[in-house]
Amino acid sequence: EMCIRDRGKGVLICENEQQAADGVKEIMLDKKFGASGNHVVVEEFLTGPEVSVLSFTDGKVVKPMVSSMDHKRANDHDTGLNTGGMGTIAPNPYYTPEVAAECMEKIFLPTIHAMNAEGCPFKGCLYFGLMLTPDGPKVIEYNCRFGDPETQVVLPLLESDLLHIMQSCTDGTLAQQEVKFSDGAAACVILASGGYPVAYEKGKPISGLVDGQLPDEENVTVYHSGTAITEDGQLVTNGGRVLGVTATGPRLTNALSHAYEAAEKISFEKLHKRSDIGLRALKALAEKQ
């Protein structure tokens, strides 16, 4: 088995050579994902829970943020095409202290040291997309930026001052800077246009929001992605992933129920969302008890 990836818009899982050939044709010739398919990468197929770890670094030390779990497939039960992400939860229950220590020793610090050795020191936010395989943690992807929609559940849990952390990354004092996260949880549910990630319509009026947010909702933030405002002031859809509804709570169950309750108050024509964000994480938590 193998994976065929374009420039971030989609991934095809291929079980044999014929599926791989068909996949390359769909991406590169049929332009299934548009211009993102001008180049593809063929990768080994790995299995295991996925973990997203955003981290701060000043080029010398790495301070990971709270872990998160993305939900890439478009539909429930992890079916359908891969997307940019249909929802996230934090923290990720599969990312135990033991796994975190192994990642720091074998992945995070070696990455920073290697970049320094190549004369390309990095300062800022470094995103590690990991898979916890039977052979240990493996790197699926790096990003030199915050992740979307991971950031929507990570930063709401940050208790330290973000500006001070960013400043310490630039001036090389991150080792002395506190990076503290709350003990709570966060969940984000993406509201997408029907047909995403392939063909979808734009310009659908969005209802339920006041000044872009849900009124009278505590611990809920609506993040805008594919939205626009018409000349007459109407908020409309303008992309595949339209809105992200994030809720925080003392436990994951609280955050998830609140996020879904809030999402129900928003509507637009052909709205699509997954109904099972976080269920895998809840099962993992239940197994630990």
Regions found by a protein language model. Give the residues of each.
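Short hydrophobic/aromatic beta-strand micro-patches
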Residues: 56, 190-192, 246-248
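Short amphipathic alpha-helical segments
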Residues: 8-10, 187, 239-244
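Internal nucleotide-binding/catalytic subdomain
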Residues: 10-151
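Short beta-strand/turn micro-motifs at beta-sheet edges
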Residues: 75-77, 176-178, 228-235
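Generic C-terminus detector
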Residues: 227-232, 236-289
